[in-house]
Amino acid sequence: MSKIQSFGSGVYELELTVPVRSTKFQPGQFLHLTLDDFDPTSGWWPESRVFSIASEPKQTFVTIVYSVKGNYTKRMEDELVVGKKIWIKLPYGDFVIQEKDTPLVLVAGGTGVSPYWPFLLKPRETGAVHLFYGVREENHILFFDKIQILKSQKWFHLHLMVENGSVKDLPYKAGRLSVSEIKNELGEKFDLADFYLSGPPVMIKTFKNDLTSLGIMDSKVHIDEWE
């Protein structure tokens, strides 16, 4: 464990140095993390939790973000300190963001923004990527510095929704993120876009149903589901 950053309200960013030359995964995939001892010769993997990878591939570290919501993540909050050695395994998942000629709409609620960063940090010159990001308040905005850098890129379009309070140095709207808000912002591009959904399960279910009701085909809606 090389870095721990707290965002308040039980939300943390962790940076883990890995004992390999570089990490290999595709943007959108996740890893398993366990707090318990693991013997690679036993073939038995202990209890663990899964977290989206928020750093770029081919690095000597991986970054994840988690929110304290149960006994295991409470253990993480209590037990993880800089310098502690823990076991992870990766990569997993098929929530892989594909480059397309059509607009890409990345929808994130809270820590659900994490799997998008390996994709957003890739250099690109063309295309249109819309990040619709909903948070409760300013201090819950993850990767604030990276967003500030990206907002100057012509291909990147930030749509930040904040439920409480105001935000300095980033454009935002007050309120809760919704499919109707996304449709209003995209206009005629709405029917052409591919949608990626990441966030709390209730949010994902609601957004998926709302997109379907507006005529968006299932093949154009991609959900961050961990199995």
Predicted regions and their residues:
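Conserved beta-strand elements of the Class I
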Residues: 103-107, 196
